[in-house]
Design a protein with these regions (language model features):
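Conserved catalytic or regulatory cores that recognize and/or transform ribose-phosphate-containing ligands
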Residues: 1-95
Length: 95
């Protein structure tokens, strides 16, 4: 069983792309893994607070990162991917 962080675009997308994140979460759970869905994390004050929190979660708890469609247009997803690569964390695409 792996712990998989879900990364994808949020800003500028209706309901912060919640539907795509929840769909990915269900797929990951169906495969028998633990999904780390940022929509389920605590509310924070600023974008920078969210990003710092998310990067720490990836570095400390994730075995893999699952990239949603459109991740390449998201500065936050690019930073999350960079941390995953730096830490040697598995990277996968999820639709």
């Amino acid at each position: 069983m792996k712990t998989i962080y879900i990364s994808g675009p949020m800003s500028g997308i209706e309901d912060l792309n919640r539907e795509a994140f929840e769909s990915a979460e269900k797929k990951i759970q169906k495969m028998g893994h633990i999904a780390l869905n940022p929509h389920r994390f605590p509310e924070l004050e600023t974008y920078e607070d969210y990003l710092f929190f998310d990067l720490e979660i990836i570095a400390m708890a994730a075995d893999a990162i699952a990239l949603l469609q459109g991740w390449e247009n998201s500065p936050g997803s690019k930073r999350e991917l960079a941390v995953a690569i730096q830490k040697g964390i598995e990277v996968m695409l999820i639709a």
